[in-house]
Structures are given as C-alpha cells and as structure tokens.
C-alpha cells in the first residue's frame, strides 16, 4: 500500500458534475482522496454533484455516504425511497410529490425534507469545507452561484431538471438545474486552490444504440447531449489540472438501483484519479 500524501501538499479543489444516477460514481472519487489521506480545500457541484458535494463538505466520508446510499436503495422497511427498488418511473414520481402542473411534474418536497433531516447543517457557513453550488436562472438564462446563506434550497434548485421538477424561487429568481448552464463547474475553483479536479459523469454511449428510445429517455438524453457539448467546449479553453470521466455504460438518469454496476464501472477511474494526484503532488 502506498504511503499517504503529507498534509503539506498543495491545496486541492474538486468539482462534482451533473449526471443523475451516474453521480454515484462521485463517491468513488471521494474514496480516492480518502485513500490518499487528502481533503479538498474547496468543492463545487452541479445537479447531483451539488447533493454529493454538500454531504462531503458537511464532513461525510465516502464510507458514510455509501452507507446512506445502501439504506436508500436497500431499505429494510418502507421508506420514501422505496421507489428505488422498482424501475417504474411512476414510483419515482410518487416519492417526489408528483403534481401535474405546468411548472413541472415533481415538487421534490419529500427529498428536500430528507436532506434537511440528514445533513447536520442548513447554511453554507456551517460546512466544514467551502462549497459552491450552481443553478440556472430560468428567465435570465444565466448561471447563479451559491456559496453563502441557506444551503437546502440552492441544492434543490441545482438538481431541478426542467420539465420534471418544479423550479425553485430564491430571492425573486426562478431557478432550475445547474446542469443547464454549467454541468461541470470546475471553473469556480481556479482562484481558490492549487490543483483543480473535475469529475465528469455525463452520459457515454448506450449499448442499445439501434433502438428507438422511450419518451423520457429521449428527453433526458437530449439534455445530456447538450451538457456534453457545454463541457467539451469549455475544456477547449479552460482545462482542470485533473479531468476524470468514468466510463459508465447503460445507466440512465434515474437508474439508482444500478449502484453496484456504477461502482464496478467507475473503479478504474478511481485508480486513475489516485495515480494522477500522486504524480502532481510528488512534483510539488
């Protein structure tokens, strides 16, 4: 086993990207840092990355977050997350307070309550690690960055997929999913650390490329294609010090029940992150 990196190493910033269930892979990237005895000095997140980033910034280890995930997808008793045992998207809607209204199918108040009950903090200032969360101003079509004040509502805004979740109103701004403008917000880290890490969990090709996709799949895949384009264009002009993209196949936006498959497929990316970090830190 390799020696842990000394605490005098340069400061690290890590960005957790959007990607739905594939965001489970973020936990392996946190494990990579844990294995090396490292903690970031700054975190940024968009959509599912904002959720993971909040728990990490609040002090949860990768192991603790895995335990929470296991409770959610393998509940021993009935819970609001029982939908995860089913593939039927209608069950998912039920869990998230479905309301067939013009602003979106899902209110998301149950999940918001879950966040409030499990996160030990409710404000950015109470986090152990500084965190920046990205959402999108629907009407102004611009990025909104949160790093102070209330924590829970910005998280909800950041994962509010347009047309599915109802938008979130914060200070007279109507906000939707951060992935619409910045699905991998590593650019927010560059002035706050020596080494920037970007974890991209946007979709790669599906195996069933010749099939006509179901309605929801086609909508989400189109949205993810847009996210891929945003990230690829940004990488041309501003590169993080370490860019990691786990090769996760056949995992759709709400395939949280495929956690074991995601962990298996993302394992090589975890080892890649460790190797790249060791190289950079040993040069310092």
Regions found by a protein language model. Name each.
Residues 1-46, 54-284:
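Patatin-like phospholipase
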